[in-house]
Amino acid sequence: MHAPVEFHSTLDTSVEGLKTLIQNQLKFSLARDPRTASARDWWLATSKAVQCVVIERLMATQTKHRDGNVKRLYYLSLEFLMGRLYINSFHSAGVYGNMEQAIRELGLNLDDLRAEEYDMGLGNGGLGRLAACFLDSLATLDLPAIGYGIHYQYGLFKQEFRNGYQVELPDDWMKYGTPWEIVRPEHTVEIELYGQVENVFDNLGNYVPRWTDTKKLMGIPYDIPIPGYGTNTVNFLRLWSSKAHEDFNFEAFNRGGYDEAVRDKNASETISKVLYPNDKTESGKELRLIQQYFFVACSLQDIIRRFLRSNKDW
């Protein structure tokens, strides 16, 4: 077990301090008037308020790990069944009692606010729940760790019953955004697919193969802080969203090829659309394979980048 992270918070987490923090989030982050704010507005404001406490500890944790050049555990999984983070964040940040009272003194009901949270569409069953539990446990044990997965737009599916039959609908859990994630565009990575290998030798006769005619994709990372319980340690889960290398074909658009202009964008973003796409077709099998290759390739690049930042060689 590593030594716990020690730091002195700059935030006032008393009841009055949290009330001020919530009201500031409502005003400055959401631009909402308290008199007309909806339950969802207040849920977002209170979520962002507790996230401030968590992020302060996240930054202290990552600074400690970086300065100590610690070894990290990396956990890669196609799914993470995170559950709802609202109340869990209150407990992990050690502010549940004060936050509950602050919410009550603002004339709000905690049960009404917690009902506004959507489950993250990042996991399906046992494998995803196990992965999420591992991340929670690692943070609680003060172990340096980072999770890696895919930033699914729709997750698995939303189930409805019509006339006695199951109907599968897209689960757009990101419809209204989420206060728990932090986009990290500065750590975007590029990966390549398909293409062919050219057998090439240099002047000394060394074999130096070239990978050519590839399709390029961009992996955009989104971080979700993972606070430990009863400790200041906060690790994070990094999720990759797939984007086209070239979003828009302006030449095709100008000649009237409107579908062609966004074809690469649509094809590339399909990779992070849905958890476990139907693999009964050849295209479905290919998509599943590409999903796994995509997030592993992105994650390995990120791991190597982080290692080389603190180490000159292997």
Spell out what each predicted region is.
Residues M1-W314:
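A conserved ligand/cofactor-binding region detector
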